[in-house]
């Protein structure tokens, strides 16, 4: 799980009920194979994360100066009205594709299932014209999200809402090989048991969040990991949904290694979405902006 820094208010996790998927809605969602409406995000995807939209002009300049058009995850803060993000999302969408994170995993437990559904509807209604990908669940298998039944209910309901409006939906899983607290939360085991079959077939994107700092510095065999993920989600574009480190001496090496990684799995699209873009690459004069831009230029395509 990433380190939450800058203007984040503290908080943590949630409680129980699995939705009975309304038969008509489930059949519509599971059968839906049409291309989502809105802009098609080209591949490979060069992702970054913006967790604070202040200094908007500096953010958009850093984004627009990159060698290739990026895709920017905007983290929608907890208990914030979507109107707050209207101008930032519009301005960022002019220089970048946009992935909207409905709620960071750290705060999922603070929302009831009904509140999560309400939040999804509110953000979709306010920003659907400028958000290209909707991240309906973030680090969804993390032990800190609360009661599993509630987590699944939030994920599936948000997915159903997004797909009922023919928008692109993403789920981010948390890679935790040998560093999980509960065996049931191991990434593949949790996804197999808790992601419904219609979502396994219908998700537009499935991302992996991974922080080496969380897993004792483990460097997994990512080719094998993504090959296995592809089997579970055969129709989804796959890649990294979060990477990063808070260790200053490691940032440049991590950036270069992840963004230039060569993975040959079909439907692998990169992603990466460096969590600390707002802190590390804004303004454009920061050294790590140059490192990121060089890594994007060198990335396989």
Show where each model-derived region lies.
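Surface-exposed amphipathic alpha-helices with a cationic face
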Residues: 88-93, 155-170, 175, 226-233
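An active-site-proximal structural segment forming one wall of the substrate-binding cleft
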Residues: 110-136, 150-163, 184-202, 256-265
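Substrate-binding cleft of secreted/luminal carbohydrate-active enzymes
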Residues: 239-301
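Distinct, well-ordered alpha-helical segments
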Residues: 57-60, 85, 113-123, 179-199, ...
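Sec-dependent signal peptide recognition
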Residues: 3-6, 14-20
């Amino acid at each position: 799980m990433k380190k939450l820094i800058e203007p984040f208010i503290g908080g943590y996790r949630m409680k129980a009920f699995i939705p009975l998927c309304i038969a008509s809605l489930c059949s519509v969602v599971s059968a839906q194979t049409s291309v989502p409406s809105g802009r098609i995000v080209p591949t490979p995807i060069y992702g970054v994360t913006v967790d604070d939209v202040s200094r908007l002009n500096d953010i958009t300049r850093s984004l627009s100066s990159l060698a290739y058009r990026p895709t920017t995850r905007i983290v929608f803060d907890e208990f914030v009205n979507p109107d707050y993000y209207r101008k930032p999302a519009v301005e960022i969408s002019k220089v970048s594709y946009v992935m909207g994170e409905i709620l960071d995993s750290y705060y999922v437990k603070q929302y009831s299932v009904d509140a999560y559904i309400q939040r999804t509807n509110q953000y979709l209604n306010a920003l659907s014209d400028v958000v290209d990908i909707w991240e309906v669940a973030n680090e969804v298998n993390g032990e800190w999200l609360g009661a599993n039944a509630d987590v699944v209910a939030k994920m599936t309901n948000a997915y159903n809402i997004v797909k009922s409006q023919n928008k692109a939906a993403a789920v981010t899983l948390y890679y935790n090989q040998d560093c999980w607290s509960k065996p049931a939360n191991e990434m593949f085991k949790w996804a197999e048991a808790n992601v419904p079959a219609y979502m396994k077939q219908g998700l537009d994107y499935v991302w992996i969040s991974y922080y080496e700092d969380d897993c004792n510095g483990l460097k997994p065999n990512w080719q094998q990991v993504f090959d296995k993920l592809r089997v579970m989600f055969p129709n989804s574009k796959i890649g990294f949904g979060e990477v990063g480190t808070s260790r200053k001496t490691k940032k440049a090496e991590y950036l270069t290694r992840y963004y230039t990684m060569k993975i040959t799995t079909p439907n692998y699209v990169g992603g990466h979405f460096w969590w600390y873009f707002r802190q590390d690459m804004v303004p454009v004069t920061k050294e790590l902006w140059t490192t990121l831009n060089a890594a994007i230029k060198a990335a396989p395509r």
